[in-house]
Regions:
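Hydrophobic and amphipathic membrane-targeting/association helices
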Residues: 1-227
Length: 227
């Protein structure tokens, strides 16, 4: 009997062991991978329009690179992310469903949130008005470790904490007027809405920067007129 015949005979004898072994391994892989957390990544681009700044006396009124740095730093700042945390919390409390996934939050994550939510905070939720709920939570928030809205941001909670939100990538796309935002989390709705909320905060911040620059330009021309 040559080696080929020997191997063929050997594998034929253990064919059932191989079959059941393969099925067992497949079943174990399927079973254990169901407990692995899914992750969802969302990319978003924000148009800044910074390079359209006005030149005065040969020098730019708005330093382009500095302005982009300011916008990015604002987006990464703790103050901005705290606002995102409150608005995200309000959004999920208003739209969450205990038994049905939706575009805002998965049911399991809503249940986890409600389980740790104090009754006094739940009483602040107005399901008919997101803006009112945001205002209520903002007014309730105090810099105190016993304050739920404050602590959920400053402790390692998923989705709403500084650690979670600080993982958002904010960068300028090359030399373009686009700012790219990239975020990954375990909930598709939360991932997408987190970026939407942050984009809104960045747009507000940029409008303030532009308003400040416009005031500087007006002051410059007024000064020139007085000379």
């Amino acid at each position: 009997m040559n080696i080929v015949q020997f191997l063929a005979s050997f594998f034929y004898r253990i064919r059932y062991w191989l079959l059941w072994g393969s099925l067992l391994v497949t079943a174990l892989v399927i079973y254990f991978t169901q407990f692995l957390p899914y992750s969802y990544t969302v990319n978003s681009s924000l148009y800044a329009g910074v390079t359209n700044g006005t030149n005065l006396d040969g020098s730019q009124l708005i330093n382009i690179n500095s302005t982009f740095d300011n916008i990015i730093n604002i987006g990464k700042s703790k103050n901005t992310l705290a606002k995102v945390s409150v608005r995200l919390l309000a959004t999920n409390l208003v739209h969450g469903d205990e038994w049905k996934d939706n575009m805002y939050i998965q049911a399991k994550h809503y249940r986890q949130l409600v389980q740790i939510l104090p009754k006094e905070v739940l009483a602040l939720v107005d399901r008919s008005s997101l803006d009112k709920t945001v205002t209520n939570l903002m007014n309730y928030r105090k810099e105190n470790s016993s304050n739920f809205v404050y602590s959920i941001f400053n402790r390692p909670y998923p989705f709403y904490s500084y650690n979670a939100l600080n993982s958002i990538i904010i960068k300028r796309l090359g030399t373009s007027d686009l700012i790219e935002l990239v975020y990954t989390s375990a909930d598709p709705g939360i991932t997408q809405n987190t970026l939407k909320i942050l984009e809104d905060e960045l747009l507000k911040a940029y409008e303030q920067l532009r308003f400040s620059a416009t005031n500087s330009a007006i002051a410059y021309f007024e000064e020139q007129d007085r000379k």
